[in-house]
Design a protein with these regions (language model features):
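Short, solvent-exposed interaction modules
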Residues: 54-102
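Long, hydrophobic N-terminal alpha-helical segment
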Residues: 1-25, 29-32, 47
Length: 111
């Protein structure tokens, strides 16, 4: 039995938690083929990484585990709504603003 796509997306974001924490902004991308996540990763500029301890010294706010949880909830919710979508590219662009995470979703279906 195959793993449902929303569960796979949740697993991917859980796997990326450490990489996402400490970023001010970036994009999570997933390549999906026949309902299976084949490749995934995070794109970001190096200057968007906040070094440990830097948040205490300035107004800089970076992603923390709680924001990753919110991103996971939003990402899986989007996939649940796209029930007929099985192949293509999905990306979640995120940015931290005033302590909260803002996310936009882009998906491109391939037939």
């Amino acid at each position: 039995m195959s793993i449902p796509l929303p569960v796979q997306v949740d697993m991917v974001l859980e796997d990326l938690t450490e990489e996402l924490c400490g970023l001010k902004e970036g994009t999570v991308f997933l390549q999906i083929e026949d309902g299976v996540v084949k490749t995934y990763g995070v794109r970001h500029r190096l200057e968007n990484r906040v070094e440990p301890g830097a948040e205490r010294d300035s107004q800089v706010v970076a992603v923390r585990p709680r924001q990753v949880e919110l991103l996971r909830e939003m990402a899986t919710d989007v996939v649940k709504r796209r029930t007929q979508w099985t192949t293509g590219m999905m990306s979640y662009r995120f940015v931290m603003r005033k302590g909260s995470i803002q996310v936009s979703v882009d998906y491109k279906e391939q037939k």
